[in-house]
Amino acid sequence: MTSSSSSSGSPCGACKFLRRKCAKGCVFAPYFCHEQGASHFAAIHKVFGASNASKLLSHLPISDRCEAAITISYEAQARLQDPIYGCVSHIFALQQQVVNLQAELEILKQQAAQSMIFADSPTSENPNSYYGDTTKAPYHHDHQNIYHHHDQTHLVYQTGSSGTVQHGDATESSYHNETSSGMGEFSIYSDLEQHLNTFNQDHLKELQSANFGYISFS
C-alpha cells in the first residue's frame, strides 16, 4: 500500500478520490497509491470519514502508520460488506475455525495414542505365529502325546503280553515297561501309606492307654 505519488507529482489515491492536490507531506500519500488507493480510500471515507482517518494517522508514530492504514482499510471494507457486525463476523468465523481445528487435533492425538498402545500390546501378535511356534504351543503337543500313549496302551492290552508288541515297535515295549514300573511305584507308595496309618493307630492306642493308666493310678 506504500506509495511515492507525491514525489512523482501525481496525487495519492486519497487525494485523487477527494479530487484535491496532494500537498507535500500528505499523511495518506505513503499508504494509498495512485492506481488502487482511490478504491481503498473510498471505503474509509464512507465509513470513517477522511478527516477522522487523517487525524488517526497523524497521532500515531510513523512506524505504526502503515499497519494502522491497513487495519482501517480492512475494517471499512468489512463494514460495507456486513453493516451490522463488520469485521466482528470475520473474527467469530476465525475463532470457530480455531475451535474446530483444536477438536480435530485432539481426536488425532487420541487416535495416535490408541495406535501406539495397540502396537505395544501383546494381543497384537499374529495368532498364527503362536500355533506355528513349538515353544509357545505345548498344549497341542501334549494332546498328541496323550493320543500316542493311549494308542500304545491299547496295543499292549490287545497283545495280552508283558513283552513287546507283535508289530515289533520298540516304543510300545518301553512304554509298557514304564507303565509297569509306575504301577510298582504306586503299590510301594500304597504299602507305605498303609504302614504309616497302622503306626499312627498303634501310637494313638498307646497314648490312650497311658492316659487311662495315669488316671487310674492317680
UniProtKB/Swiss-Prot annotation:
- Alphabetized InterPro entries for the sequence: LOB
One GO biological-process annotation of the entry reads: lateral root formation
Q: What induces it?
A: By auxin.
Please describe the organ and tissue distribution of this protein's expression.
Answer: Expressed in roots.
Record's Pfam families?
A: LOB
Extract the coiled-coil ranges from the record. none
Disulfide bridge map: none
According to the UniProt record, one GO cellular component term is: nucleus
Q: Which residues form the LOB domain?
A: 10-112
Protein's job: Involved in lateral root formation. Regulated by the transcriptional activators ARF7 and ARF19.
Question: Which family does the entry's similarity section mention?
Answer: Belongs to the LOB domain-containing protein family.
Indicate what this protein is called per its UniProt record: LOB domain-containing protein 29
Q: Which organism is it from?
A: Arabidopsis thaliana
Q: Which gene encodes it?
A: LBD29
